[in-house]
């Protein structure tokens, strides 16, 4: 890797959150054109963080040569809307991320960790494979998980919708189906904290109904009209919130 990762983590993410791991992994999947994404959270018990394993899999384009080169050159963004540093948060919470990406007649395997050398050549396969990329997060690097909500599917669902609403709503308006599944597997439940094996999913039907307004300004050179989508959400104890 072309940057010292441990120092970069402290520089770019002084106050990270475990939810950023989900956000970054899902962002990568959506950027790769995935229509089906699964976030599988496996932990023996909430108070046994060393057993935590998270697997994020999708049916997107995967680690093609272009995508892998961008990943290897850590600070090279996809475009002006991406900073190119998000995946650093992976190593703030996990010591290693095992990556397997297959598509057509190729497969690429590598382990993303501190000191990653950027070497992951394509393996040519005999038979054609369906597109699938899986990131397996192992070696939880913290003493504890801060909140049950960091692992509970029903708590993560609204956060994911809020974070990716513009992208998901655009897909919905274009008639493109998608499904994002969040699954928790644990052998030691906590009924008081509503912590137990559970699965939920995000589909177009889960998105709020957006209102469209068109802003027109003939003085603009390239674009005279801009479409803006918004919705107003009631927030308990706080009135309404414009999103």
Which ranges hold each PLM region?
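Bergerat-fold GHKL ATPase/HATPase_c domain
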Residues: 1-34, 38, 42-43, 65-72
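Conserved beta-strand core positions
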Residues: 35-39, 52, 97
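GHKL/Bergerat-fold ATPase module in large chromosome/replication-associated machines
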Residues: 176-243
């Amino acid at each position: 890797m072309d940057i010292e990762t441990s120092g970069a983590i402290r520089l770019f993410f002084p106050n990270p959150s475990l939810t950023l791991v989900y956000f970054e992994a899902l962002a990568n999947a959506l950027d790769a054109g995935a229509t089906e994404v699964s976030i599988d959270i496996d932990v023996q018990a909430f108070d046994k963080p060393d057993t935590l394993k998270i697997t994020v899999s999708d049916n997107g384009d995967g680690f093609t040569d272009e995508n892998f080169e961008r990943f290897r050159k850590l600070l090279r963004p996809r475009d002006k809307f991406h900073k190119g540093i998000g995946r650093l948060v992976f190593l703030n919470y996990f010591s290693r991320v095992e990556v397997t990406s297959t598509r057509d007649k190729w497969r690429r395997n590598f382990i993303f960790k501190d000191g990653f050398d950027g070497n992951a050549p394509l393996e040519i396969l005999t038979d054609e494979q369906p597109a699938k990329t899986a990131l397996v997060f192992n070696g939880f690097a913290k003493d504890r998980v801060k909140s049950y909500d960091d692992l509970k599917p029903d708590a993560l669902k609204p956060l994911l919708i809020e974070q990716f609403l513009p992208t998901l709503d655009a897909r919905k308006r274009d008639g493109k189906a998608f499904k994002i599944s969040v699954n928790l597997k644990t052998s030691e439940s906590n009924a008081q904290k509503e912590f137990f094996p559970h699965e939920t999913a995000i589909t177009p039907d889960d998105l709020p109904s957006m209102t469209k307004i068109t802003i027109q300004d003939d003085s603009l050179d390239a674009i005279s009209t801009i479409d803006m989508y918004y919705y107003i959400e009631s927030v308990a104890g706080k009135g309404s919130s414009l999103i």
